[in-house]
């Protein structure tokens, strides 16, 4: 069975078997996840980002510290801290040069780090046939666009130039990320610096437009579903600095179909009840089939980095591993 058919089958299974019924596992877990979120969390984070934009980052530092908890890792995964900003996850007891996933964490470009994406990176590496390089890029608003993007491009270049040291196959480097990290992965793939360096992309509910898009999902899920519109707009302002929001390096969704067809083969996994859902859907449609899109209809934002939506997380890990290890 070809990869496209495999992904279609998985998408159908996610919709029909675990995503279609109102009492599905994904829906029950997502609803429980939302109910467990502290009251006022989104408003607190929005205010913290807005204060940081104005020059007072004390509240944002508190948010960053709260998202920087060490994670318990799998016994069959070893971790190498290559530098302050690069952490390599390697499956134990596997010989030969493996494919590599270079992963960019989410957090609205303003918080998150190596620890916030550790659970996902560890889970992918634990599958046994992929190494994962997590990247701690500079954060906004202290370091607005293009600082974080430059750091991510540098990480891909480092992996490409040090394949022997890392024990990877330089021809099978992929990049990925969730939310704002997915935005960075897209921009890296289309950058002149990394053109041709990536074999594939794996994206989870990526930001593809750094502005309020007014779509159906933006209106319907803009409050109470894990990422509120006010917080997303604060993230956008922080990252943009003085950059035009229609710059294609921050709003890849504005690229033409011809430009998007320059992407490596891409898997986009969407949450059905997410403010960013329609951005990703439009991007996939515009790509002319370059982007394979899978939707978990009952999931909400954050299933990659914040525990609570275990079924969506597990399926995302499985899809990632299958996509990256699929030989072309």
Language-model region placement:
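Short amphipathic alpha-helix adjacent to the substrate-entry channel of hydrolases
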Residues: 115-133
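Gly/Ser-rich "nucleophile elbow"/oxyanion-hole loop immediately N-terminal to the catalytic nucleophile
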Residues: 160-174
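Short beta-strand/loop motif that positions the catalytic acidic residue
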Residues: 268-270
């Amino acid at each position: 069975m070809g990869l496209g058919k495999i992904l279609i089958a998985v998408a159908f299974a996610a919709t029909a078997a675990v995503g279609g019924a109102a009492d599905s596992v994904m829906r029950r877990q997502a609803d429980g996840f939302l109910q467990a979120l502290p009251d006022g969390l989104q408003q607190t984070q929005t205010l913290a980002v807005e204060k940081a934009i104005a020059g007072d980052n004390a509240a944002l530092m508190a948010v960053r510290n709260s998202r920087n908890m060490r994670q318990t890792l799998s016994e069959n995964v070893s971790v190498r801290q290559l530098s302050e900003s690069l952490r390599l996850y390697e499956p134990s007891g596997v010989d030969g040069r493996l494919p590599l996933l270079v992963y960019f964490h989410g957090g609205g470009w303003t918080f998150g780090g190596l620890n916030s994406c550790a659970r996902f990176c560890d889970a992918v590496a634990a599958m046994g046939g992929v190494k994962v390089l997590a990247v701690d890029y500079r954060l906004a608003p202290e370091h607005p666009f293009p600082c974080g993007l430059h750091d991510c491009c540098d990480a891909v270049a480092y992996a490409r130039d040090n394949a022997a040291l890392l024990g990877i196959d330089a021809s099978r480097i992929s990049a990925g990320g969730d939310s704002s990290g997915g935005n960075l992965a897209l921009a890296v793939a289309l950058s002149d610096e990394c053109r041709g360096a990536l074999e594939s992309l794996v994206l989870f509910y990526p930001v593809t437009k750094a502005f309020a898009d007014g779509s159906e999902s933006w209106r319907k899920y803009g409050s109470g579903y894990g990422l509120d519109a006010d917080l997303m707009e604060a993230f956008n302002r922080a990252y943009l600095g003085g950059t035009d929001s229609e710059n294609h390096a921050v709003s890849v969704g504005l690229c033409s179909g011809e430009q998007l067809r320059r992407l490596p083969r891409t898997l986009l996994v969407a949450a059905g009840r997410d403010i960013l859902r329609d951005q990703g859907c439009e991007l996939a449609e515009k790509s002319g089939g370059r982007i394979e899109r899978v939707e978990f209809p009952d999931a909400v934002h954050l299933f990659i980095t914040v525990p609570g939506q275990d079924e969506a997380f597990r399926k995302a890990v499985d899809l990632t591993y299958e996509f990256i290890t699929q030989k072309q």
